[in-house]
Amino acid sequence: MVPGYYRPAVVKVNLGAIRRNIKNEMQHLEPNQKMLAVVKANGYGHGAVEVAKVAEEEGAAGFCVAILDEALELRRADIVKPILVLGVVSPEYAPIAAVNNVSLTVPNLEWLKDAEKYLAKENLQLKIHLGIDSGMGRIGFNEDDEFVAANKFLENNNNFFIEGMFAHFASADSDDETYFKHQCEKFKHMKSLLTVKPKWIHVDNTAASIFHSGIKSDLVRFGIGIYGLNPSSNPSSPDLTSAIELEPALSFESELTHVKTIHKGDGVGYGSTFMAEEDTIIGTVPVGYADGWIRKYQGFKVKVGDEYCSIVGRICMDQFMVKMPKKMLVGTKVVIISNNPSDPNNIKAAADYVDTIHYEVACLLNDRLPRVYYEK
């Protein structure tokens, strides 16, 4: 989408908060442990390149992304440290990854064999991480025989450099550790089958790092924590206590573009789902579901000036309306999402309101909303 630079609606990102979150995690790492900063999905909506540069300054060993295009974006921005693509990349694109010094995830033996054909044609060597499905049910090796065969295939194979082996926890953010421990044991078992020697063995994500201890992992893939958000933040449940201080970095702000008084019997929005019962002051905000502010936020309270005001009527594609207790001027600041966790319109409150997680709220705020960076 085209960024709306001529519209008063922006996502603000405090790079100072990002920096402090990374520093806090770096101090929390075990001796000899390193950090990979996860900046997939445009840095969880915060801006991949800008976040990566801060992480690089603070000593991150490298980066994780979800798709090859995200890795190439970082390379174009002169990010030179290792980059791992966590998702499955089609084998035909393995040479592109190799040329750009990007590491790819190996999900199974078939992928290895297919990728080798493309790499051999161009006499290239690709850095790879062996993905293990220890219980996430997503991608990676989960059968002993296939994993053993993959190890044998890789022995003395010059088209691949085995940089890592990893898995992903499904429930490290839960206070019930039963399945978490099951995954640990599964990963430990698969590790015992290795005949090749990866440079890095890694299984820690943000939740595993800040809620658990004693996991032998060369790297921590620090994702949601970079952005100051607690990974245990599920709707209608209390957060687990983080071992490090987390400071939210993102806020979402706009302004009133129109203010009017409507009268008894007047409706607001498509379907007139709000009907005035008396004279009512309505303000219009130039943000809608096309920006990622979905229709389910009808009724949510945003801060207009110094007042918390309910969104009334259905949220439109490009605008929404609020009911105000007093007349305010066009241009009055509207804080849709606050980066202060004590405010009632913080990102967890926004996520809870629509029965989702704050990861999704941040990621949905799309490119039509310019990002404004500051350090405080």
Curated annotation (Swiss-Prot):
Named cofactor requirement(s): pyridoxal 5'-phosphate
GO molecular function: alanine racemase activity; pyridoxal phosphate binding
Listed pathway(s): Amino-acid biosynthesis; D-alanine biosynthesis; D-alanine from L-alanine: step 1/1
Class of the enzyme per the UniProt entry, highest EC level: isomerase
Keyword Isomerase: yes
Binding site for substrate: 138, 317
Keywords for the protein's UniProt record, in alphabetical order: Isomerase, Pyridoxal phosphate
Reactions listed under catalytic activity: L-alanine = D-alanine
Modified residues (N6-(pyridoxal phosphate)lysine): 40
Biological processes, Gene Ontology terms: D-alanine biosynthetic process; peptidoglycan biosynthetic process
Highest taxon of the lineage: Bacteria
Active site: 40, 270
Alphabetical list of Pfam families matching this protein: Ala_racemase_C, Ala_racemase_N
This protein's GO CC annotations: cytosol
E.C. number: 5.1.1.1
Function per UniProt: Catalyzes the interconversion of L-alanine and D-alanine. May also act on other amino acids.
Similarity remark: Belongs to the alanine racemase family.
Protein name in UniProt: Alanine racemase
Organism: Lactobacillus helveticus (strain DPC 4571)
Gene that specifies this protein: alr
